[in-house]
Amino acid sequence: MKIIADTHAHTLASGHAYSTIKEMAAAAKAKGLKALALTEHAPEMPGTCGLFYFQNLDVVPREADGVRLLMGAEVNIMDPDGMIDLPEKTCMDLDIVVASIHPPCYGLDHTPEENIRAYVEVMKKPYVNIIGHPDDGRFPFDYEILVKTAKETGTLLEINNSSMRPQSSRKGTRENILTMLDLCRQYEV
């Protein structure tokens, strides 16, 4: 498989990454990527971009170092009803929207039923393109429902390499990723 795009990347603007857009575009080019999605964390994540950042992305060039730049956001799923932390209009103006559960924004005390409801509700939003790192065992849920809903809504499910790092705070990721991939194969997702 030849990877041609990175659809979930953070710059210095997200507060926990270390590269500029220019540096990331150069690295993407060196890896042979054709496109790079800049998906900074949305406002409820501590230390990241405010709303104005996302509303002002039209001033950023759409190409750097021969790599197409997609303007996006990694929105935070805030509750079991699928509420996110960017307005619909802002999301509709972006090229790509990744929706993820992060502990600072979504409590660890939700039930598996609430967790899958959060994912299902957010996948119903027409501007959500990808579910980010749905592999964290701290937020258990039914992967079969996730995969079936992704197929119904045309939402991509991310395999996030950061989840597999030994120092990752996410739990049970390898097993969860394998379960998700098996179900994707079974349901032809």
Kindly give the residue locations of the regions a language model identified.
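N-terminal active-site segment of His-dependent metallophosphoesterases
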Residues: M1-K31
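Extended substrate/RNA-proximal surfaces in nucleic-acid metabolism proteins
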Residues: K2, K29, A42, G47-I159, ...
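Histidine-centered catalytic micro-motifs
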Residues: I4-S14, L38-H41, I131-P134
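Histidine/acidic-residue-rich catalytic or RNA/ligand-binding cores of hydrolases
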Residues: G15-Y18, T48-L51, P140-T149, Q167-L183
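Well-ordered alpha-helical segments embedded in enzymatic catalytic cores
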Residues: T20-M24, A118, T179
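Aromatic/hydrophobic pocket-lining residues that form π-stacking "cages" and hydrophobic walls in ligand
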Residues: M24, T39, L57, L146, ...
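Non-catalytic positions within long, well-ordered alpha-helices that form the structural scaffold/packing
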Residues: A25, K29-G32, M123-K124, R185
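Short acidic/histidine-rich active-site segments
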Residues: E188-V189
